[in-house]
């Protein structure tokens, strides 16, 4: 019933089996015990609670970005909130990873050799200007700061508008705003968030059962 199947399929089959035993008990054998009522099985096939993420509004994100005066920080915030990049992906970027409106992610989380991120031309121009201003070599990191420093920068940016802000809130905003603007969920999933499956994107958008974001 369960081997080789996804957890959601397992839960559905468990529910069906439990309903079958209840039917037998109610119609044929009231003394029969439903084996699906065993606590260990109920715990194993328990459905996850729905998680409601706090989604940032567009005007809040715009204000955060516009009021961030440090060029490096502003570009990093835009890469997360406009392009849907993970903070770890932003920190790995080098000039060699930029190709006009395309950013190349090498050895991404998905396990592929590379993935592409698409950004507006105007934003691409500002990124190139920043790289030239810093005089960076092709393989130097564009944002040579630690993960902790980057998270702290995001939190500080959120305080500008009295919002508790985390890097993944910005990535989730990119997905939500695109979806609300009419972008098909398949495009949001494969192009913006680069998820392996659609169900992960649905959780981002609050349309499925919650789990840890990726």
What are these regions (language model features)?
Residues 147, 163-182, 195:
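Short basic/aromatic active-site micro-motif
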Residues 120-163:
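Active-site/catalytic core of tyrosine-dependent DNA strand-transfer enzymes
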Residues 1-50, 134:
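N-terminal core-binding DNA-recognition domain of tyrosine recombinases/integrases
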Residues 98-100, 164, 183-203, 209-210:
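Short, polar N-cap/turn motifs at the start of nucleic acid-interacting alpha helices
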Residues 44-62, 111-121, 137-138:
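DNA breakage-rejoining catalytic core of tyrosine-based enzymes
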Residues 17, 76-77, 84, 88-93, ...:
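Alpha-helix N-cap/helix-start motif at helix boundaries, enriched for small hydrophobics
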Residues 58-87:
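Basic, Lys/Arg- and aromatic-enriched nucleic-acid-binding interface segment
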Residues 83, 88, 92-126:
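Conserved tyrosine-mediated DNA breakage-rejoining catalytic core shared by Y-recombinases
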């Amino acid at each position: 019933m369960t081997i080789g199947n996804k957890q959601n399929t397992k839960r559905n089959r468990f529910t069906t089996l439990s309903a079958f035993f209840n039917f037998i008990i109610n119609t044929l054998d009231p003394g029969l015990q439903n084996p699906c009522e065993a606590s260990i099985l109920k715990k194993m096939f328990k459905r996850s609670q729905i998680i409601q993420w706090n989604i940032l509004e567009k005007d809040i994100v715009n204000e955060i970005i516009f009021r961030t005066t440090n060029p490096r920080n502003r570009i990093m915030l835009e890469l997360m909130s406009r392009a849907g990049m993970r903070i770890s992906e932003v920190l790995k970027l080098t000039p060699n990873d930029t190709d006009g409106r395309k950013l190349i992610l090498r050895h991404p989380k998905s396990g592929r050799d590379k993935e592409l991120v698409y950004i507006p031309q105007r934003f691409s121009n500002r990124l190139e200007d920043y790289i030239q201003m810093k005089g960076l070599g092709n393989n130097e990191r564009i944002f040579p700061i630690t993960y902790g420093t980057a998270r702290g920068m995001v939190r500080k940016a959120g305080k500008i508008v009295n919002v508790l802000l985390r890097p993944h809130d910005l990535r989730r905003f990119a997905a939500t705003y695109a979806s609300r603007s009419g972008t098909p969920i398949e495009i949001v999933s494969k192009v913006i968030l680069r998820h392996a499956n659609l169900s992960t994107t649905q959780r981002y958008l609050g349309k499925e059962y919650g789990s840890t974001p990726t």
